[in-house]
Amino acid sequence: MDAFNKEQKDKLQLKAVYELKPGGELPDVVLAEQRTLAGLKRHGSLKPVAFADGDRLPQKFRDADLSWYGVFYDPIVFLVNQQYARTVGQANICSWQDLAGKEQLRIALENLSDSNSTQNFLAGLADRFGEDESLEYLGSINRFIGQYSKFPFTPVRMAAVGDADVAITRQSYVFKYLENKFPAYVVYPKEGTPVNLFCVGLFKNTADDLQGLKVMEWLMTSEQVQAIAQENATGYLFLFPRGFDEAAADAEKIWLNSSYLEPVKQDGLTNKWLSKVRFSK
């Protein structure tokens, strides 16, 4: 926000609102995770808007009814303990199938029923492979998981200190720790990976569509936004990683939760994971 406000030189100023209070005044622009935007759309809170920059996004990264547009994403990655990698070879820890094919492996993973983020991971796999195949895969690595973690940073700590060989986690959880002497490193699964997609949209009550669009376009196209994200070690990756004038990221390797955005559908999938994987006999 500070960067945008300095650039505007008092012509248009942004103020952050981090929580929507019942009966409170709605902001003009919303930047949030895809499930939040999908919920706002279901409740009729967003205003469809078409603009040229939005049309450049691959279709899977924008709402079919023009209610929201993707900006950046937080991918699921492997955090691999350095000592373990030296034992088995880095070339043997590159894919989802590499994990399932191991005879011995200690995996650290957050409980997949605890949060929107973990449920998106579960849903992203199911959207990519189908429910049966994704649950079968998670069942195949379940034997490597001693206990599902309650807190998101626990898997990171376990991989770093050697209590786990591999952590399956969000890049945003680990990026700030990645220094030369950090005892673990990040792997992007070569097949692709589930992500949390962060999107931008206009609230229905916005007083000025053009000013709102200016903010949306800045988020999507400004190289300064990417630079700020990198400087602050957010771990977020942008849909136009080499700049808005270059090609978009490979959509085939970015797995979205597209079919489980409604709570009842997500809860159904989560309950299947609980019964068929975590607490299976």
Regions found by a protein language model. Name each.
Residues 1-39, 43:
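Early extracytoplasmic/lumenal segment of secretory-pathway proteins
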Residues 25-29, 47-78, 96-97, 108:
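A structural signal for short loop-to-beta-strand junctions that line the ligand-binding cleft
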Residues 40-49, 60-66, 176-188:
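Ligand-binding "clamshell"
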Residues 56-60, 74, 107-113, 137-142, 148-149, 219-242, ...:
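Periplasmic-binding protein-like
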Residues 64-71, 80-82, 87-89, 102-129, ...:
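Short beta-strand->loop
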Residues 79-84, 197-208, 227-228:
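A bilobed periplasmic-binding-protein/Venus flytrap-type ligand-binding module shared by bacterial periplasmic
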Residues 124-189:
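Ligand-binding pocket segment of bilobal, Venus flytrap-like solute-binding proteins
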